[in-house]
Amino acid sequence: LRKQYITFSKADDDDLPARIERIWYINPFGQEIRLQANPRVLSALAEAQAIIYSIGSLYTSLVPSLILKGVGEAIANPSIRYKILILNSTNDRETGPLSAPFSALEFVAAIAKAGAESRGFSGDVERQEYKAYVTHLIHLQGPGTPRVDKEELNELGIETIRVYGRRMEEGWLAYDEKALIQALEVTMGKRGADMVAAMSRRNTLEG
């Protein structure tokens, strides 16, 4: 494995030959291995009241961290009330193809599957188990954004919060920092006057 046989480019827009099904680690001999998460990470998760899955590449940033031993068990702990996915504003090669891009539900399913693999389980995860890993989903809505089926997610116990973003020169939507912070505050239980003010500004945030 000292010679690189795989060429990878995130800038390449061509569809992958097939959808990514699974991510795993290998040792120098090409054998699959299961790595333990950093103890400091597990300690932080044990004390956390909220987890935020931030914007980024699903299979080259998020999933490799979730499949580490101990992470899935820590995230699935019911004492963590808020497990918030900030959904990407666009799909990329990892979540294609262009003809059938990932929906929000498929992002959630991939996260749940990674969490289950961290715990030693293989195969797909039952849909009713998704909320053990994701309880809330913040998203944009517009051309090019992943499809969000609010009713379907709500039936699984996952709350959705729509945020209005900014149209960039390249044509894609980006999260507005103020609106995103506002959505996180509302999601994590900031009620009263702040919530009323947030929900009344329909040009910024819609639940």
Residue ranges and their predicted role:
Residues 1-52, 57-207:
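Conserved catalytic alpha/beta core of Sir2/sirtuin-type deacylases, generalized to analogous enzyme cores
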